[in-house]
């Protein structure tokens, strides 16, 4: 699946789970937080799309997605990123 298609799938997943993805600019990598009781994931739109996708995959890998339908390519991507992080190989992505 192409990076832009993965990004679209992450946007759909975020809406389904009640999250908002904020595309910001600045000196930050990105991540999840709660802002005035809203669940948000902030990603840096100045970073390459691969890095933005990695941030989203990391955040969604922390959530219980067992009962949530994901297209197989998205679930596979989230699992791959999660496994790299667990193995301490996130710098090799």
Name these PLM-found stretches.
Residues 1-29, 91-93:
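Auxiliary, metal-adjacent structural segments of Zn-dependent hydrolase domains
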Residues 52-61:
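Short alpha-helix carrying the canonical HExxH Zn2+-binding catalytic motif
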Residues 75-93:
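Post-HExxH zinc-binding segment in Zn-dependent metallohydrolases
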Residues 61-73:
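Catalytic Zn2+-binding segment of zinc metalloproteases
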Residues 25-50:
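Active-site scaffold of zinc-dependent metalloenzymes
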